[in-house]
């Protein structure tokens, strides 16, 4: 539905507009949350997650284009895989899927899709770390991957849960032990990884100077890398943000200010936020958290989200001169979708909203330094 509404948000010092005249994009054929995607030229690829083993493409330069299904992904259904494009091909890594015993397990396989002949190929490699909750982006001839859950710990939790069968007391005991740990004891990935398709090799690009993350917003533009929030342990996010730069001596990192709290609310960090660049401005929006979890953690409760409800968000943040501010709100809460920068807009594709409902919508947001436009 197209909406026309302009509001001057004096509290946010910005104008934001719901545009009725700009290009709109067709909805996805199915709701896709916890999936992945990449942009190759003018064509966006989105799939997996709640979309099963399907991938879909949309030609963004064609105003009349519709989503098209491509060859079925051969690695089976999976949630939270990582994808990126290098040299005109799509690469998909890892994710979370059920094994033959019905146990949810992290997988570390890798696949390549070639648009020229609509074929997939399983690659003769495995990621050196677990790739659930990881975030990926391409730079030059490599895919860079940040963060992710520990394969052994994550898989062990699900194996123990399935082994407990219908014994609720045992399952509760397993869950309590799993969540009642310090962030560092989950051993989230703390190296920046890279994969180079031309050599089929993984590389440790150096330890990140901040805690391991799952579900962080991660973007590469030019030589700059930006990391926003993410989980530091299951159920607990951080409001921290960081910036890296590719140099001759490797990636050099610095801390940015924490993401600010919306007026009248706490800032409990975000996981599953969407991000990208518009007219040179870095935008972050959506994501989910457990309001009150940071407070409980600071009070000494390691199971920081115990008794709290998950909340999805709609604030739009921008980074300008090293400072964050809120410049508007989306018409709906959103998280765990796919975002991509295209034609000075950030496209928000699929995802989930309140209660975890999968979305089919495709929204576009843009910001010129004064006005946020939502299409």
UniProtKB/Swiss-Prot annotation:
Which of UniProt's keywords are assigned here? Carbohydrate metabolism, Isomerase, Kelch repeat, Periplasm, Repeat, Signal
Is Isomerase given among the entry's keywords? Answer: yes
Signal: is it a keyword of this entry? yes
Q: Which reaction does it catalyse?
A: N-acetyl-alpha-neuraminate = N-acetyl-beta-neuraminate
Q: Name one GO cellular component term.
A: periplasmic space
InterPro entries associated with the record? Kelch-typ_b-propeller, NANM, NanM_proteobact
Q: Which Pfam families is this protein grouped with?
A: NANM (PF24996)
Which GO MF term does the entry hold, naming one? racemase and epimerase activity, acting on carbohydrates and derivatives
Q: What EC identifiers does the entry list? A: 5.1.3.24
Q: What broad class of enzyme is this?
A: isomerase
Q: Which NCBIfam families match?
A: muta_rot_YjhT, PRK14131.1
Cite the record's note on assembly: Homodimer.
Q: Which family does it belong to?
A: Belongs to the NanM family.
What is the protein name stated in its UniProt record?
Answer: N-acetylneuraminate epimerase
């Amino acid at each position: 539905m197209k909406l026309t509404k302009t509001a001057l948000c004096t509290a946010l010092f910005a104008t934001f507009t719901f545009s009725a005249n700009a290009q709109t994009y067709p909805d996805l054929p199915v709701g896709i949350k916890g999936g992945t995607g990449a942009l190759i030229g003018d064509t966006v690829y989105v799939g997996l997650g709640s979309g099963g083993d399907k991938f879909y493409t949309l030609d963004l330069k064609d105003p009349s284009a519709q989503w098209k299904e491509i060859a079925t992904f051969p690695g089976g259904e999976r949630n939270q895989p990582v994808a990126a494009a290098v040299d005109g091909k799509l690469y998909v890594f890892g994710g979370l899927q059920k094994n033959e015993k019905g146990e949810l397990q992290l997988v570390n396989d890798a696949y390549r899709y070639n648009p020229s002949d609509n074929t997939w190929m399983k690659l003769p490699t495995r990621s050196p770390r677990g790739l659930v909750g990881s975030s990926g982006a391409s730079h030059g001839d490599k895919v860079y991957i940040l963060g992710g859950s520990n394969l052994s710990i994550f898989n062990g939790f699900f194996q123990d849960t399935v082994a407990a069968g219908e014994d609720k007391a045992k399952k509760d005991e397993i869950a309590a032990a799993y969540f009642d740990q310090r962030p560092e004891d989950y051993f989230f990935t703390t190296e920046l990884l890279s994969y180079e398709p031309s050599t089929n090799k993984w590389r440790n690009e150096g330890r990140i100077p901040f805690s391991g993350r799952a579900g962080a917003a991660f973007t590469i533009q030019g030589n700059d890398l930006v990391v926003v929030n993410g989980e530091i342990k299951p159920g607990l996010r951080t409001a921290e943000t960081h910036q890296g730069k590719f140099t001759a001596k490797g990636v050099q990192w610095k801390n940015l200010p924490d993401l600010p709290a919306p007026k009248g609310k706490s800032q409990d960090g975000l996981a599953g936020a969407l991000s990208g660049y518009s007219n040179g401005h870095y935008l972050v929006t959506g994501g989910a958290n457990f309001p009150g979890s940071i407070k409980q953690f600071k009070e000494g409760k390691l199971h920081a989200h115990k008794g709290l409800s998950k909340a999805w968000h709609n604030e739009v943040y921008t980074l300008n001169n090293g400072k964050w501010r809120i410049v508007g709100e989306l018409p709906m809460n959103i998280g765990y979708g796919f975002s991509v920068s295209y034609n000075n807009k950030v496209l928000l594709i699929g995802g989930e909203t309140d209660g975890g409902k999968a979305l089919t919508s495709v929204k576009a947001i843009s910001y010129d330094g004064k006005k946020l436009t939502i299409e």
